[in-house]
């Protein structure tokens, strides 16, 4: 039973990582074509909202979402803003500072954050996962060392790391807080819809800032943001949250679910190089990517 659940969690996580890779590739594409990162972030959630409303509404399950929000509006708006707003805004901004494969490789810091968030929810840190955490951190250092050395201190590389570190903490934190708040009352799609609705004030403010700073987005950026909304904000997020829902009561399996996002590295590297002509990683960076993937595999093994 548990082995079958582990396989299901692993399969859902890897599938979600393939769809999440679209985010990194298209965010970089929008950046290279002159699109403002603020609109890339805002439009993803603006477009995903009506899609989710239709998905939940067709099943007649909207009322439980509104009822849950009315009972705990403060918690809903806070953790939705943390889990979606403070996750995706810095992650999108980070695409300004390097190729898509670098951004997605650094995003594996989520695995590290996920392990150390357990005590906040009354669960122990999975000791078997600590070795994987150390390996992933080593990979991150190797990945950025060449960038820093070749850019006289690597200010942009450090900014990129800082932005992704923020996203790596806020995403699992917001997700887990909302799982605790909702319990079994809402399914994954309902929870994602509720979080999208409650993060809208954040996106409205950010959109006003974007409009004042750079004007409205281009048609090309708008279309690409729509694709990101469908593939990443809806499909990938639902798959990932379903995996974490299955693992919610087992800290080892929860770390496994969150660890599968490392599959994004392979999908994004291939897409970035083939579609965007991103520069290939240097020798040390290849080693760093390999070390990060090895850390993911160690984390999966620790969860068995």
PLM regions and their residue ranges:
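C-terminal-most transmembrane helix of multi-pass membrane proteins
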Residues: 41, 45, 254-304
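Transmembrane alpha-helices of multi-pass small-molecule transport proteins
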Residues: 33-86, 113-117, 135, 169-174, ...
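Glycine-/small-residue-enriched transmembrane alpha-helix faces in small-molecule transporters
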Residues: 1-43, 151-180, 200-205, 269, ...
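Hydrophobic transmembrane alpha-helices of multi-pass small-molecule transport proteins
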Residues: 52, 128-147, 283-303
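Hydrophobic/aromatic residues within transmembrane alpha-helices
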Residues: 30, 40, 44, 93-95, ...
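Cytoplasmic-side transmembrane-helix entry/capping segments in multi-pass membrane proteins
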Residues: 10-14, 69-78, 125-138, 185-195, ...
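Specific transmembrane alpha-helical segments of multi-pass solute transporters/efflux pumps
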Residues: 19, 24, 61-104, 142, ...
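Helix-helix packing/entry segments at the starts of transmembrane helices
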Residues: 17, 43, 102-109, 181-199, ...
């Amino acid at each position: 039973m548990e082995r079958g659940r582990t396989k299901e969690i692993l399969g859902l996580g890897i599938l979600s990582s393939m769809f999440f890779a679209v985010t990194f590739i298209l965010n970089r594409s929008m950046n290279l074509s002159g699109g403002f990162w603020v609109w890339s972030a805002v439009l993803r959630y603006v477009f995903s909202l009506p899609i989710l409303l239709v998905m939940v509404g067709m099943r007649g399950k909207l009322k439980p979402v509104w009822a849950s929000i009315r009972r705990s509006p403060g918690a809903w708006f806070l953790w939705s803003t943390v889990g979606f707003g403070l996750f995706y805004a810095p992650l999108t901004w980070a695409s300004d500072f390097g190729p898509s494969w670098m951004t997605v490789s650094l995003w594996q810091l989520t695995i590290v954050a996920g392990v150390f968030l357990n005590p906040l929810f009354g669960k122990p840190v999975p000791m078997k996962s600590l070795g994987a955490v150390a390996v992933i951190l080593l990979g991150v250092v190797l990945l950025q060392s060449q960038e820093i050395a070749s850019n006289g201190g690597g200010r942009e590389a450090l900014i990129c790391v800082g932005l992704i570190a923020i996203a790596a903490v806020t995403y699992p934190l917001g997700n887990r807080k909302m799982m605790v708040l909702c319990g079994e009352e809402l399914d994954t799609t309902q929870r994602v819809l509720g979080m999208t609705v409650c993060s809208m004030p954040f996106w409205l403010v950010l959109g006003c800032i974007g409009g004042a700073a750079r004007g409205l987005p281009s048609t090309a950026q708008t279309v690409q943001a729509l694709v990101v909304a469908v593939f990443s904000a809806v499909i990938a997020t639902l798959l990932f949250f379903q995996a974490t829902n299955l693992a919610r009561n087992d800290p080892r399996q929860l770390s496994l679910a969150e660890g599968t996002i490392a599959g994004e590295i392979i999908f994004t590297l291939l897409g970035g190089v083939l579609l965007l002509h991103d520069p290939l990683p240097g020798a040390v960076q290849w080693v760093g990517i390999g070390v990060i993937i090895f850390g993911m595999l160690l984390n999966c093994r620790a969860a068995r």
